[in-house]
Swiss-Prot record:
The lineage of its organism: Bacteria, Pseudomonadati, Pseudomonadota, Betaproteobacteria, Rhodocyclales. Transmembrane segments: none annotated. Belongs to the RNA methyltransferase RlmH family. Homodimer. Specifically methylates the pseudouridine at position 1915 (m3Psi1915) in 23S rRNA. This is Ribosomal RNA large subunit methyltransferase H. Its main location: cytoplasm. Pfam families: SPOUT_MTase.
Length: 156
């Protein structure tokens, strides 16, 4: 089983890549965390936002494994505590399918992509910079894994 972060956009600041890579490196071999970047649709005047999101959705669909659990990151998604995310992680491991966490572009995700997801997750009620999602999600997944292993990284 793999954890995939499929994110629209590339050429993130060095701190974004360093943060993501640090927590991906800490994950165990049996639960690798991998980043797949998808090119953002150019924001040009006169092009409807819906068309740009649809183009990004097609690129996302093209890189998703055929059988994977889709979890979209969305500001209207469900809140999860670390303990709840750890329980979900254990359940996903029991099912054995890859899990793809899908991060949209500046305008979010196309409705069709949201509808195809098994779950929707909100990282925070705060408005955060788009680039912060990658290292924040990687840390949350690493922390959830440490909870499942009673590792001292997470403290209540």
């Amino acid at each position: 089983m793999k954890l995939l972060v499929v994110a629209v956009g590339h050429r993130m600041p060095a701190w974004v890549d360093a943060g993501f890579d640090e927590f991906a490196r800490r994950m165990p071999r049996e639960l690798p965390l991998q980043l797949i970047e998808v090119k953002a649709e150019p924001r040009t005047s006169g092009k409807p936002v819906e068309a740009m999101m649809a183009a990004e959705a097609a690129r996302i669909e093209a890189v998703l494994p055929p059988r994977c659990r889709r979890v979209v990151l969305d500001e209207r998604g469900g809140d999860r505590t670390t303990a709840a995310l750890a329980r979900r992680l254990e359940a996903w491991q029991g099912e054995g399918e890859d899990v793809a966490f899908i991060v949209g572009g500046p305008d979010g995700l196309a409705p069709s992509l949201k509808a195809s997801a098994a779950e929707s997750l909100r990282l925070s009620s705060l408005t955060l910079p788009h680039a912060l999602v990658r290292p924040l999600l990687a840390e949350a997944l690493y922390r959830a894994w440490t909870v499942t292993r009673n590792h001292p990284y997470h403290r209540e």
